[in-house]
Design a protein with these regions (language model features):
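Extracytosolic ligand-binding ectodomains
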Residues: 1-131
Length: 131
């Protein structure tokens, strides 16, 4: 959410606004950030951290280096790459949409939550590894 109050989010929004202006993107200052943008931003930074740690772009070495690493996301939380399944530990936020299209965050977790890789609500998943 653009409305998340965190220094990391302020920096993320400022960088995005500068990019929009520099490239004269349609919509100008009305353009907003969104979850796919943040996910890409986090993913690329975590990949770069893993490449640096591995000292190579070799896929197996980078995958191994990603396990357990953290990155401070625009949400202000330090997200973690799970060591066993590479799912991302993230916070949960519930927001109420406002007239301006932004969200008022009405509830959020105090910490990141480990992802559940196999939903118990999808038939057949009970046979998959719990990792």
């Amino acid at each position: 959410f653009m409305s998340v109050k965190a220094p990391e989010n302020d920096a993320f929004k400022k960088t995005w606004a500068a990019y929009v202006k520099k490239h004269n993107l349609s919509g100008g200052t009305d353009r907003v950030t969104n979850d796919p943008m943040e996910a890409t931003y986090v993913g690329m930074h975590m990949w770069a951290q893993a490449v640096t740690k591995a000292g190579t772009t070799n896929v197996d070495a980078v995958r191994k280096a990603m396990a357990g690493q953290t990155f401070k996301a625009p949400s202000g939380f330090a997200l973690k790459m799970d060591e066993t399944n590479h799912h991302l530990w993230k916070p949960v936020m519930i927001g109420e949409i406002q007239a301006d299209g932004q969200f008022d965050i009405v509830w959020k977790t105090d910490k990141t939550i480990r992802a559940q890789p196999w939903s118990p609500f999808i038939p057949g998943n009970e046979k998959k590894s719990k990792m």
